[in-house]
């Protein structure tokens, strides 16, 4: 099958970015290429055209490949709801919530849909570039594996192992991986690469040769650190943790324990008129914030309790009294109302939780999950916007008479009588340039001519150039069989 797989020596070694760059490089060679990740764990999901969901990293990789995101690109998606359990999405559809022990028992049965999705992609494209998850060196997870070597062997896909020199110990990472995995798994590895190098690459020549000598694997190159990665949609909430910008308007967002779809913040952190700050657990909401954003969450009632435990409810009321603005998105919108009821226990124990009371609305959870892309207009400015909805629950109440937007001919969201508190189910809306500019002007912020989508395209091209300059891309792609 025409495929090659990038696995890593650990999490956050840059696998997702490498696959995105390789997809763009292959596309520029005239190949029909598609990304594929057998199993992902993320609360940052993208909605596909057919109403399914996949990891947002695979959506970015699809964009790099010039494709619409498809559920086959990420057939198994785990969305953590607690420390013990995750919602399981198979081929875009929710199949239930499993505790960790139950997941390990069920995992082997999911190889069939994984191979089914992979087969459809390989039949439709010249090349499929596969991304592993975590590391194959986690040999305690090898039994029933569908994400790394279990998949590679089942699908007969050659593997290139990526190590991360930025965190140190890359020689031990790569040589150690070979030492702990089964010989049959090691035989699937065709080579390695070193990612995130800082400084003069020539200084690592000896270490590079040592890895080749110790493993017998071919090296495909050393990739210098790519700072423009910060301009691409964040895959992990920690990527947004560093304050960005030096603008006059401070935008503070609350780092919930189950934060989801935080890519809403990506366009904002690139606006020069803003300073975007993550409020971490235990920290107060900064008094200088002009806007506080309550982002999405995988557990609205759970994170509402988490919010109160940090004292953020008191901070939000003080912020509102000072004349500050508040925006709730999806789960954050639900929190702003009077109550959040979950009679069927879809996100935890059945029951109801008192909301923050900043909007006169109530939310009731129900099992029908809304997954859809939308286009509409922002009511206050009249500017067009687009985005997506991905939520359970319906929200209603008097403040819905002041909708945030109109989408597909219906009102969406809610606003307080004073206009300073708004809520919406729409993710991704800040990628709409005209709307974003109008919204920020309403806050008194200096706006820019940022064309967000065009910038993402430019960075993907630069990423492909970067890999072409430092990797044997032709040799790596030639591994596909």
Curated annotation (Swiss-Prot):
Q: Domain of life here? A: Bacteria
Q: Does the keyword Ubl conjugation apply?
A: no
Q: What CDD domains is this protein classified in? A: CobQ_N, GATase1_CobQ
Signal peptide positions are none
What are the protein's GO molecular function terms? ABC-type vitamin B12 transporter activity; catalytic activity
Pathway terms, separated by semicolons: Cofactor biosynthesis; adenosylcobalamin biosynthesis
The GATase cobBQ-type domain sits at: 248-435
For this entry, list what GO says about its biological process: cobalamin biosynthetic process
Q: Which UniProt keywords apply?
A: Cobalamin biosynthesis, Glutamine amidotransferase
Family assignment from sequence similarity = Belongs to the CobB/CobQ family. CobQ subfamily.
What is the stated purpose of this protein? Catalyzes amidations at positions B, D, E, and G on adenosylcobyrinic A,C-diamide. NH(2) groups are provided by glutamine, and one molecule of ATP is hydrogenolyzed for each amidation.
Give the matching NCBIfam families: cobQ, PRK00784.1
Family annotation (PANTHER family): COBYRIC ACID SYNTHASE, DETHIOBIOTIN SYNTHETASE
Tell me what this protein is called.
Answer: Cobyric acid synthase
């Amino acid at each position: 099958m025409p495929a090659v797989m990038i696995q890593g020596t650990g999490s956050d070694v840059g696998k997702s970015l490498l696959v995105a760059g390789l997809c763009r490089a292959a596309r520029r060679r005239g190949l029909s290429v598609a990304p594929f990740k057998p199993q992902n764990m993320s609360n940052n999901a993208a909605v596909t055209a057919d109403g399914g969901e996949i990891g947002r990293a695979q959506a970015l990789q699809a964009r790099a490949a010039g494709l619409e995101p498809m559920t086959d690109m990420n057939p198994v998606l785990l969305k953590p709801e607690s420390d013990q359990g995750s919602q399981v999405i198979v081929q875009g559809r929710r199949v239930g919530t499993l505790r960790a022990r139950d997941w390990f028992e069920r995992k082997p049965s999911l190889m069939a849909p994984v191979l089914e999705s992979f087969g459809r992609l390989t039949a439709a494209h010249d090349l499929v570039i596969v991304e592993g998850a975590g590391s194959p060196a986690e040999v305690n997870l090898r039994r029933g594996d569908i994400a790394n070597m279990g998949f590679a062997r089942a699908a007969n896909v050659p593997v290139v192992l990526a190590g991360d020199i930025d965190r140190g110990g890359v020689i031990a990472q790569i040589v150690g991986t070979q030492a702990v995995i089964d010989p049959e798994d090691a035989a699937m590895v065709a080579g390695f690469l070193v990612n995130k190098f800082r400084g003069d690459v020539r200084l690592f020549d000896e270490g590079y040769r040592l890895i080749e000598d110790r493993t017998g694997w071919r090296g495909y190159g050393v990739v210098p650190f790519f700072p423009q990665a910060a301009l691409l949609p964040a895959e992990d909430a920690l990527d947004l943790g560093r304050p960005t910008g030096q603008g006059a308007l401070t935008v503070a967002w609350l780092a919930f324990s189950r934060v989801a779809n935080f890519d809403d913040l990506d366009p904002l952190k690139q606006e020069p008129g803003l300073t975007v700050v993550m409020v971490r657990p235990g920290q107060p909401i900064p008094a200088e914030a002009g806007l506080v954003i309550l982002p999405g969450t995988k557990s609205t009632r759970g994170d509402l309790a988490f919010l109160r435990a940090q004292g953020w409810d008191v901070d939000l009321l003080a912020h509102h009294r000072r004349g500050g603005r508040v925006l709730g998105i999806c789960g954050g919108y639900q929190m702003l109302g009077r109550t959040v009821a979950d009679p069927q226990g879809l996100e935890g124990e059945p029951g109801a939780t008192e909301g923050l009371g900043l909007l006169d609305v109530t939310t009731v959870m129900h099992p029908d999950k809304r997954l859809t892309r939308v286009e509409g207009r922002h009511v206050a400015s009249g500017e067009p916007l687009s985005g997506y909805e991905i939520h359970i629950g319906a929200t209603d109440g008097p403040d819905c008479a002041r909708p945030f937007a109109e989408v597909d001919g219906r009102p969406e969201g809610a606003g307080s009588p004073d206009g300073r508190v708004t809520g919406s189910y729409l993710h991704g809306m800040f990628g709409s340039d005209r709307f974003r500019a109008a919204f920020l002007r309403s806050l008194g912020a200096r706006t820019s001519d940022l064309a967000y989508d065009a910038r993402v395209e430019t960075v993907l091209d630069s990423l492909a150039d970067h890999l072409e300059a430092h990797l044997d891309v032709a040799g790596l792609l030639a591994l596909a069989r």
